[in-house]
Amino acid sequence: MYLSIIILPVLGSIVAGFFGRKLGVRGAQIITCSCVIVTTILALLAWVEVGFNNIPVTINLFRWIDSEWFNIIWGFQFDSLTVSMLLPVLIISSLVHIYSISYMSGDPHNQRFFSYLSLFTFMMIILVTGNNYLLMFVGWEGVGVCSYLLVSFWFTRIAANQSSISAFLTNRVGDCFLTIGMFAILWSLGNLDYATVFSLAPYINENIITIIGICLVIGAMAKSSQVGLHVWLPMAMEGPTPVSALIHAATMVTAGVYLLMRSSPLIEYSSTVLLICLWLGAITTVFSSLVGLFQQDIKKVIAYSTMSQLGLMVVAIGLSSYNIALFHLVNHAFYKAALFLGAGSIIHAVADNQDFRKYGGLREFLPLTYSIILIASLSLAAFPFLTGFYSKDLILESAFGQFTFSGVSVYAISTIGAIFTTLYSVKVIYLTFLANPNGSLMTVRHAHEGDIFLTLPLVILAIFSIFFGYLTKDIFIGLGSSFFVDNSLYVHPVHEILIDTEFGVPTVFKILPFIFTVLFSILAILLSEFIPGSVFNFKLSRFGYNLFGFFNQRFLIEMFYNNYITNLVLTLGSQTTKVLDKGSVELIGPFGLEKGLMNFSKSLTKLSTGVVTSYALYILLGLISFIIILYLSQISSSLIVLLIILTLFSLNFNKQ
């Protein structure tokens, strides 16, 4: 059963990719969807068996690297963390496969698309189930390559190619530091196997663990789109919408958070790394929510909300609340996939227009999509008793429950981020469904709900967005829950704050984020509905124009990267090419050698004078040289050759 979870998606990918021409579009769709759905059912069984019965499973297939003390086994482990990660990955992957049957129906390259989707799922399973850092890195690189292939799926579009290259190169920065971290683990601990590394971690110097932890955090920053290495995330929206749902809801962007959770027995011994995670997540949350508020593309707004929620997960990791981070990761995957697929349904209905300022009044034409996006947005805003409520607010409470300066500061910053998150959710719903129609008459007239393949995944995700958090809260975060007794998530006793969070935080600070989000949402709707001129006039003022431009241009971070990093590197590269490659190297190498030989040959030809006495002199000099060579045989051959060349040149010089 456990090997089937790993093998089935790659079998579907191979069949659809290599034999898609023989199978046809429908055959490729049936095979890939069947493989992923069966894998999902098996993963649910594994979740029950491993999680509830506390029976972790390890499978060692074969020895991959065997070099004296360095041994890597191609092995997989299924513990409570692994099966919990497989749950959203495979459920959402199977729903995206079904959704894509309708969404990509008019595309001529269906087989290739479904092959890429299944391959992406397989690589994510490898990343999650690998029992050592090297095997995890195989999956890590695999999802990077698959995201490149999927984002640039419509390869004739320049924007898609640019976005895929941006995502690929930005992730290479994180991969570089992750590789350095793995080398540091190998140097300090002598192995990359999780069990060995985590059992030796308490005996290692804290400074070494800090260096390793910082490298792992930078690796996670790129993959999980934390501020600084986040620039690829909104650009990746150029791919098909099912790809956006798969990459940015449950799979690739959560890989960095998974890496930090898996490394919890390591980073728990470095308070510096935990503090970095705490502040990094808080800054990411407020940064992304501010930028998302000023975006006009419906998919980019949802992408920035993903970034904001990932920031909250990293905050939870910084608080050592790994179970809350995992719970929020799983919850977020469902309602974020619902938002992305709902956005895809809207885009499909309005002739592929993504600017939601040109929507308006779609509630009458897309009632099901409106209901699902409303449910998912309320869950995103942590509305009471929906899925997001049980994890998002608990992260904010945990920050306050640490009762430190950093904890309380992060609570305040994250609350501001949560307020802005709710504001742009309200903005999307209002401008898309409730405002007066702003699109063309033909677009509105032809707006319609999709078929069963388009709507069934949305309904299933909406059900998860309502009930999943309530049904599983005691499993993941309940006091005394035995779900993580296998130590897949390790919390140092010094960092245990769950009881303080539950019983020590005043009730007013628990409900404060919800009160603020509701008040600001009502204020935003009232301003837009009854005083629309005030917002418009503010935007036209000089201050409002500059403010809007600053946030709309994403804090000018990309401009800074282009002007001061990319251009600097390109200038340095061109100067290196000019001075070294085309300068010194060519002067010494091909050009210099050619000129030297040409000059030498010209000097030799000038010795041919046609005068007999000159030839007699050459013969005499040759005899003398031969005698000198015989008597000075102890001198090195290179010195002799040098003497001969100098003699010839001196003769030539005297001749001239």
Curated annotation (Swiss-Prot):
Organism: Cryphonectria parasitica (Chestnut blight fungus)
Name this protein carries in UniProt: NADH-ubiquinone oxidoreductase chain 5
Keywords of the record: Electron transport, Membrane, Mitochondrion, Mitochondrion inner membrane, NAD, Respiratory chain, Translocase, Transmembrane, Transmembrane helix, Transport, Ubiquinone
Family, per entry: Belongs to the complex I subunit 5 family.
Its membrane topology: Multi-pass membrane protein
A single GO cellular-component term on record: mitochondrial inner membrane
Cell location: Mitochondrion inner membrane
A Gene Ontology molecular function term of the record: NADH dehydrogenase (ubiquinone) activity
Record keyword Translocase present: yes
PANTHER family xrefs: NADH-UBIQUINONE OXIDOREDUCTASE CHAIN 5 (PTHR42829:SF2)
